[in-house]
Structure formats: C-alpha cells, structure tokens
Amino acid sequence: FINYATTLLAAADASVGGKTAVDTPLATNLIGLFNQPEKVYLDIAAWKTLPQRQLSSGMAETIKHACMADKEMFEFLEKHMEDIFAGDREACEYIAKKNCQIKYAVVMKDEKEQGLREILNLGHTVGRAIETVSDYRLLHGEALSIGMVAMTELAHRLGYMTEEEKTAVKNLLEKAKLPVEIPEYIDREALVKKLYTDKKVRDGKLRFVVEKGIGGIVEFEEGVFATPVEEAVARDIIMKMK
C-alpha cells in the first residue's frame, strides 16, 4: 500500500513506521500488525486546510521528536512556530523532513519495538491513558502534550532534566496551542488505573521512557530505554498537575 499523509499528525507519526492498528475502548494501538508501505507521500499543502486544533495535534508529535532526538530542531520550533502555523513552505518542509528522518532512523534499527523503538513512546504512558479516559474528546496530540508535561516532571525528579529544560518543553507546547494541564472532567483515579494498559508494562510494573535534557533519551542500561516507575510516583505527578 501507499501512505499519503495529508495532516501534520500523519506526517509526523503514522506515515513512517509500519504500524497498522486499531483503537478500542480498552486502549489505543494494542491490536494490529507491522506492515510497511511501499511509498510515503507527505502533502504539506494540505496542512493549510486543517483547523488549528488538528495542526496543533500534529505539532505535539513533532515536538516529541525534537525532545528525544534533536535539540537544533527544538530551537527551530521555538523560533518558527508562527511560520509553521502560517503555512510557510520552508518551515513546513523542514519539520516534515525532520520528522521522517528521526522516526525512520529509529524504526530501521528496531522495526518491531524490541528495544530502541520504545523511545518513540516518549510522553505516551500518560498520553495514551488520558486519551482513552477522555473518551477521545482529546485529540491524540492534545493528550500527548499533557503526557509530555507529566514525563518532564518525572525526568526532573529523576535528575535528567533541569527546571529550565522542563519549563522550555512546557512553553513550547503552549506555543503550539496545546493543553498542558489535565482537564477537570478527567477522573484522575481512572487515569492512574488506565496507565496499566500501556504496552510498555512488564510484570505488572509501569515503565516510562524518560527525556534527557533537550534532544536526548535516557538509556538505563544497554538497549533498555524504559524504566520501572512506582505507581505512587506516577500518581503523585498526576495528582499534582493542575
């Protein structure tokens, strides 16, 4: 098949990687298979037709890529967010190529998520849980944005991000017109329970991918990019988020 991406979210996320999955009431992305497209086309002209909310949703995955792998890209987004939203071709081409390059580099080393590919789940432990608990009222990128804020707090507590770096990520998400707080209608106890449907859970233990500074990921031991986190810690972070 050919993947023709007409949204920023598809360009940043689904177009490269080969995951073909379905969402269920239980959770997202648990039922599916790996099937690589023969070709991928990114139609950045179509981005101009998107509502602001949809464009922002795609920007969350773009920011995630910058956070995990490319500080220069992060700084570009800080300077050119308005240009991207205005449809500036050069800025849009830059992020389209960067998204593909970053994700392709990971997927080609670990197509079926045996280790390295877990880094693409940065922010998704809380993000996917809140997306489901919201009954999909939150778009994927909106939920991911909140998950990124939770992740940076964890990274800060573990000593991998400074307060300034944590704030920089939050500020960039806000600049992209993304939510950074848990909506009042979300049942936080239900959110904590939903964390356990995450595909990174092992032996009943929550596991998180953790950012290192801006543009890096913590490798906890050789080939291991997710670390167990006690429920009490995850709960405390969630309960203290506004």
Model-derived features: where do they sit?
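A glycine/threonine-rich phosphate-anchoring loop and its flanking beta-alpha core
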Residues: 1-82
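Short glycine/serine/threonine-biased micro-segments
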Residues: 15-16, 30, 56, 121, ...
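Residues in well-ordered beta-strands of folded domains
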Residues: 23, 100, 209
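A generic hydrophobic-helix recognition signal that picks specific residues
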Residues: 29, 36, 116-117, 206
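Structural motif
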Residues: 49-54, 89-90, 137-140, 201
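C-terminal charged capping/lid subdomain of soluble metabolic enzymes
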Residues: 60-62, 160-242
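Active-site segments that bind and position negatively charged phosphate/pyrophosphate groups
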Residues: 75-190
